[in-house]
Amino acid sequence: MNQQDIEQVVKAVLLKMQSSDTPPAAVHEMGVFASLDDAVAAAKVAQQGLKSVAMRQLAIAAIREAGEKHARDLAELAVSETGMGRVEDKFAKNVAQARGTPGVECLSPQVLTGDNGLTLIENAPWGVVASVTPSTNPAATVINNAISLIAAGNSVIFAPHPAAKKVSQRAITLLNQAIVAAGGPENLLVTVANPDIETAQRLFKFPGIGLLVVTGGEAVVEAARKHTNKRLIAAGAGNPPVVVDETADLARAAQSIVKGASFDNNIICADEKVLIVVDSVADELMRLMEGQHAVKLTAEQAQQLQPVLLKNIDERGKGTVSRDWVGRDAAKIAAAIGLNVPQETRLLFVETTAEHPFAVTELMMPVLPVVRVANVADAIALAVKLEGGCHHTAAMHSRNIENMNQMANAIDTSIFVKNGPCIAGLGLGGEGWTTMTITTPTGEGVTSARTFVRLRRCVLVDALRIV
C-alpha cells in the first residue's frame, strides 16, 4: 500500500467516523465525562493515587474480578451494538484478558554494580496515557489495556471507536466501580460520552499526555502517526497466512485452521486470513475441514460472493471490504448469495488463485481463501507475499523442523504459531500472556505492562558496592 492509498483510506475512515448517526450516549455513573478536558483532569488526579505498588495490585485484582464477572454481558452488548463477532468467542476473549494479562509481577527494576558504584534502573509511569480502542475487540481491549497500563502506574483516557462506544463505556464504568469498591481511586479509567474522530485527534496533541496507545487498523495508525509527535505504541493490521506442508498432522491442522479462522468471525487481526497448502495434501485437508463445521464454496459461488464482500478492486486485486459484512456469521454471508448452510457453520472456504481478491485482501470475516502450491518452498514464498509486509502473525502446520524454521525466519512476524490456531499466539490455547494490542508497526510486539513504562536511571558513584 503506497502513501496515496493510505491517505485515501484515512480520509474514508475519518469521514465514516464523523458521519456516525449513533445517538448520543448518556453519561454513566463513573468514568464517563461530558468533556475531554474534564476526563483528562480527573484521570490526572486519579493517577496520583497509583504511587504505591500495593494500590496498583489492588486495582488490578478488582479489574480481573469484574472483567470475568461481566465478561458475558459485555460480549452480548458488543455483538448487539456492533453486529460483529460471536458472543461465545467474545466471552472467551474477555475472560482471557481478565485472567491472563500480566500485572505488576512482570515489572522488575535492574541493579548494576561495579568498581564505580551502583546504578538503579526503574520502571516509571508516563502519567495519563491515551488509548484508542477498536470496534472489533472493544471490551477485551479495555480490560487488557486497563490492567497493563495501571500495572505500569498510569491512568487511562480511552477513545473508543464510535461504533462500540456503549460497550466500551460500560466496561470502563464497571471496572471503575470495582476499583473504587476495593478501596482504589476514582477515575483511573475515563472516557467521554460521545467519542468521535475529534476526540482521538485532540488526544493526539493533548498537553500533558506523553504516550498514545492505538489499537486498530492501518488507517487509524497512520492518522496517529501523522497527527502526533508523542510517543506512539501502535497495533495495526495483518493478513496472517497459514501454511500446511505434506508432513503435517492433517486432522489437527484442519481443526486448528477452522477454529482460528472462524474465531469471533475472523475480526481479530491475528486470525488466519489465507490458507496455503501443498498440493499433495490439499484435497484431504479440505475434506477434513468440512468435518469441522466448515463449508466449501464452489468457484461460481465465490464469484457471486465477491461483489457482495468487496468493492473498488484495484489492479493488484486488493479491494475495499464492505463493512456490512465484517464479522458476520458464515450462514448470513452464505445467504447473501441464496446459499443455505447449517446455522452452526463457522467458516466458508474456497479454493482460489494467489492473485484472487479474497487472498490479497484482509477480509475480517469467516471466509477463507485456499491456495494450492507445488511444494513447501513455494508455500513459504507465497505466505511472505500475501502477508503483505505487515509482520503481524503467521502460522504453519508441519512435522518438519527445518520447514518450520525456514518459514519462521522468512515471514518475520511478531507472532509465529506452529501446529495450532493463530489465536494461540495471543495466549488463547497457547503458553504466554494475553493481549489485544500487538504492536507490529512500532515494534513492541505482544504488549504487557513492560511496554508502557519509562525507564529511569539513578546512579550512586563510588558507593554501596559491598564486594
Residue ranges of each PLM-predicted region?
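Short, surface-exposed amphipathic charged segments that create phosphate/polyanion-binding patches used
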Residues: 204-207, 249, 311-321, 362, ...
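ALDH superfamily catalytic-core signature
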Residues: 30, 143, 222-347, 353-354
